[in-house]
Structures are given as C-alpha cells and as structure tokens.
Amino acid sequence: MGKVSSVLVNKLVQTDEYKNATNIMLFYPLSDEVNLLPLLKDKTKNFYLPRINGKELECCSYCSGDELCESKFHTQEPTCQACSKQNVDLVIVPALACDKNGYRLGYGGGFYDRFLKDFKRTKICCIPQELVVETVFPEKHDVTMNLIISSK
C-alpha cells in the first residue's frame, strides 16, 4: 500500500480542496488502509484525527508526535480533549470502497455517516483504483463525498 499511498498523497495535495483548507481531519490508517500521515509534514495546515466516543465520532486536534492510544477497533486515537468539527474545513474519510456517485462503503458502524450528516464542508476519499466500483448500494443515511481521489 506504500506506493499507492504516496500516489494518493501527491494527488491530494494538488487539489484546490486541499490547497484551500487550513484545518484538515484525516485518519490514522489500519494496516490495509491508505496511509495519508505524510500530510502531517505540511506545517501550513492544522490537522485533526477522529476518536470514537460511544456511538459518536469526535474530532481531536493532532500534531505529529502527540500521544495516541489504541481503541477497541484497533485504530490509533488522540488522547487530548475533543474540539468542534466546525473548526474543520476538509475531512478525509476512510473507505473499503467508493462508487462513481461519491458514496463510500465503510466498516458498517455508521460513525462517519453520523459525524458528516450535518457537515457542510468538503469530504474526500482517497482510495486505490481497484476499490472504485459502479455502486456500493448506498442506504438512506449514507453521506456522499465531494471528491473521490483514486490512484489511477
């Protein structure tokens, strides 16, 4: 996934959505997910990571080197106090697959769909080309992404 991750980071930083954002929420990758953590080297941006609290996703400010702990879902999460998602200009969302209409397939917990339900700013998925499909069979509660960036 290293080469694909590198391609996706390079494509993302060239988008207007990234260039125009100051506060960016990304995710700490699982071993089989795209690794966008090299973005943290961009000192012109403020970064945030998600944390699960009950059934909700929280937004936490993050700087490279800040303390993280492993969650019950085996993701790395910040230990600092949560902040308002209204601080965030751009959310980069993980996905198992995306379709051409901007829908994503997650892990089934609905955390991102609930978090993004009333989020009016930019939502992006960065994903390997082979995980872009015709349809992910979206459900009523699914939130569309503004942009899908593939490795192709």
Regions found by a protein language model. Name each.
Residues 4, 8, 111-112, 144:
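Internal, well-ordered alpha-helical segments in soluble enzyme and binding-protein domains
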Residues 24, 91-92:
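Receiver (REC) domain switch-region micro-motif
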Residues 54, 80, 96-99, 110-111, ...:
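Short acidic/polar capping segments at secondary-structure boundaries
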Residues 86-91, 100-103, 114-152:
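Surface-exposed, charge/polar-rich loops and edge strands
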Residues 28-30, 51, 95-96, 127-130, ...:
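Short secondary-structure boundary segments
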Residues 41, 106-111:
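Charged helix-capping and loop-helix junction motifs
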Residues 1-84:
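N-terminal active-site beta-alpha-beta segment that forms phosphate/nucleotide-binding
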